[in-house]
Amino acid sequence: MPKEVITQRSVDYNQWYLDIVREADLAEVAEVVRGCIVVKAHGWAIWELMQRALDDRIKATGHANVQFPLLIPKSFIMKEAEHVEGFAPEVAEVTRAGGEELAEPYIIRPTSETIIGYFYSKWIRSYRDLPLLYNQWANVMRWEMRTRPFLRTAEFWWQEGHTAHATEAEAEEETLRILHDVYADFVEKEMAVPVIRGLKTEKEKFPGALRSYCIEAMMQDGRALQAGTSHNLGQNFARAFDITFTDQNNTIQYAWTTSWGVSTRLIGALIMTHSDDEGLVLPPRLAPIQVVVVPIYKNDEERSLVMAAVEQMTAAWKGRLRFKVDDRDNYSPGYKFNEWELKGVPVRIEVGPKDVAKETVALARRDIPGKAGKSFVPQAGLTERIEALLNEMQTALFQRALAFREAHTADVTSYDELKEQIERGFARAYWAGDTADEKRIQEETRATIRCIPLEQPGSVGRCVYTGRETDRQVIFARAY
């Protein structure tokens, strides 16, 4: 498998990304269906590991999984003014079925606040029915004009949580719990991607939300990627769909609702945070194959010797490590090394007749390519050594990504400095502007306010655009 298939990041970052998606066998563009992709086995296996880790966290916070219809009556979408305005350009409609025009068109689910709101209005009657904490794993469709595998596609896969509460304080607590205890915790611990937790501006918040919170990550080209969002919807959807309950004083009240979601774009974040010019790099916790063993032999006698040693060695791994023994005879060891390196397998073990005689193996770690990442280690205690190494690699990938973000984030005090810094990464600045100011900056620089970080310096400075005094800092960046 020749290395020339991967464009170097320094030559064309976008093509490098597309090459990895293709050559690491993660996905393929579905050219017969506009804007869609086929997620291949290796890519879906990564998503399944993500799902498992997220689902455990979602259930640990008291939520249950449900499934709502894919098709939503168009009238539902029209009920919430901000919501319909925000999603109108992206919706796909079904107008015919069974050979006839439908009396009312259906919208193919872009998100489910409206149809879930309808059913919540039927299910909630009393304060005793609250909180209602549900999540669903689903595919959605948004008619995106410019698509890129995983990062922005017409159809994608996600989880969307939808909850209803008796008070605004409870809804706000839920919104922040999901942001911190589920999303940020998952992305940092499982994906090894550092994130900034923040509040979206009025311009950037979810259509129809009271407040939108987010986690933002930096990719290797300095751009931001929104890795997850958690929305306090206030009573907007409750009023639109008449989600009411009788409180403890026998008074009818509107519920307070939330929604939150992450999607398969996290696979794109994983690629662009950790991968290199050799191919995909995966954090061990999300690697479908954590260890690949490549037996090396020249004849049947050596094969029997080496495979017996491999079988004995890997017997202790079952239930502890996700591993694969690549004993294909129609590919050379060099081809196999390149293939598994390209697919991002964290650890490669090579075993030949000499290794069997010495009771050693050659061990190569994916996060350090070439000779620097290769060593010869004893077979005794190998299982524990690999487990420790995988933990070390998980931490090292996070620390490397964090160091990169810090090196490419700078405080700016003038608009000229801001324009210069967004060419390199994140610009942190004091901000007292309004939505019109944000729009002008975006038109002039293609940068947006990614978030208002929840951690603020507690000091006062002058707005980078208006010059007014403020104690609020924001993060500007170009984004995916």
Swiss-Prot record:
It comes from the Bacteria. GO terms for biological process: prolyl-tRNA aminoacylation. Its EC number is 6.1.1.15. InterPro entries: aa-tRNA-synt_IIb, aa-tRNA-synth_II, aa-tRNA-synth_II/BPL/LPL, Anticodon-bd, Anticodon-bd_dom_sf, Pro-tRNA-ligase_IIa, Pro-tRNA-ligase_IIa_arc-type, Pro-tRNA_ligase_II_C. It is an enzyme of class 6 (ligase). Keywords: Aminoacyl-tRNA synthetase, ATP-binding, Cytoplasm, Ligase, Nucleotide-binding, Protein biosynthesis. The keyword Transmembrane does not apply. NCBIfam families: proS_fam_I. Catalyzes the attachment of proline to tRNA(Pro) in a two-step reaction: proline is first activated by ATP to form Pro-AMP and then transferred to the acceptor end of tRNA(Pro). Belongs to the class-II aminoacyl-tRNA synthetase family. ProS type 3 subfamily. Consists of three domains: the N-terminal catalytic domain, the anticodon-binding domain and the C-terminal extension. This is Proline--tRNA ligase. The lineage of its organism: Bacteria, Bacillati, Chloroflexota, Chloroflexia, Chloroflexales.
